Amino acid sequence: MMEAIKKKMQMLKLDKENVLDRAEQAEAEQKQAEERSKQLEDELATMQKKLKGTEDELDKYSEALKDAQEKLELAEKKAADAEAEVASLNRRIQLVEEELDRAQERLATALQKLEEAEKAADESERGMKVIENRALKDEEKMELQEIQLKEAKHIAEEADRKYEEVARKLVIIEGDLERTEERAELAESKCSELEEELKNVTNNLKSLEAQAEKYSQKEDKYEEEIKILTDKLKEAETRAEFAERSVAKLEKTIDDLEDELYAQKLKYKAISDELDHALNDMTSI
């Protein structure tokens, strides 16, 4: 019975150490996830500053958003792994607690048997006194029984001491398990906080994606307007060229008319001079 209890205590101790190691691992993974979340927040802040720059860098913002989404998925996976680890720790702690309950039940049974053994020893002692009163000739046998009784008492005392030590170790293990459970609960709480932060990061990413989509739509609109203006410019240039050719033709027509007018004026002056000369000749006659 004592060997079984010792083995069970060693197994419980190993289980406790494994639980502590897994709890520390969960805390380390949680810390790593928090650092990844902080890194994502810093990257988001950088992206928000870049989005305030110029619309010409929308392609770069789109690539940065893609990287941020990949990192967010990695952080979510880390958080999910940490939550699974915490759940595993909780299941492990529950199993250890159940094992402790069974050990306590076995200890209670052993203590009850020890009490029965002590009662049997007392009855044996009373029987020895009866035998001593009934027959002094059985002194040698009585001495042997007395030695056996002392050995039984010694064994009972040793068993009592070992059971007390087992009970004390069980109390210590229960305290360690309670502290481990508190650490696991704290890690679970941290994971919940990290999950909330990751939700906020996801919302920020969605907002940035919406802004990028908005800028993309504005860029398409600007390109369409530029195309329309370019077509209008080409049309205006064509009309300007046509107008220039028309003006050149009109200017040439005006020049021709002016030349013709000048020629008519010269012709008119010549005719006037001839008329004046004819009138003068007629006057002279």
Curated annotation (Swiss-Prot):
This is Tropomyosin alpha-3 chain. The keyword Acetylation applies. The modification Phosphoserine is found at S62, S88, S207, S216, S272, S284. The modification Phosphotyrosine is found at Y262. The modification N-acetylmethionine is found at M2. It comes from Mus musculus. Belongs to the tropomyosin family. PANTHER family: TROPOMYOSIN. Residues 1-285 form a coiled coil. It comes from the Eukaryota. Homodimer. Heterodimer of an alpha (TPM1, TPM3 or TPM4) and a beta (TPM2) chain. Interacts with TMOD1. Interacts with TNNT1. Pfam families: Tropomyosin (PF00261). Keywords: Acetylation, Actin-binding, Coiled coil, Cytoplasm, Cytoskeleton, Muscle protein, Phosphoprotein. The modification Phosphothreonine is found at T54, T109, T253, T283. Binds to actin filaments in muscle and non-muscle cells. Plays a central role, in association with the troponin complex, in the calcium dependent regulation of vertebrate striated muscle contraction. Smooth muscle contraction is regulated by interaction with caldesmon. In non-muscle cells is implicated in stabilizing cytoskeleton actin filaments. The molecule is in a coiled coil structure that is formed by 2 polypeptide chains. The sequence exhibits a prominent seven-residues periodicity. One of its GO terms (cellular component) is podosome. GO terms for molecular function: actin filament binding. InterPro entries: Tropomyosin.
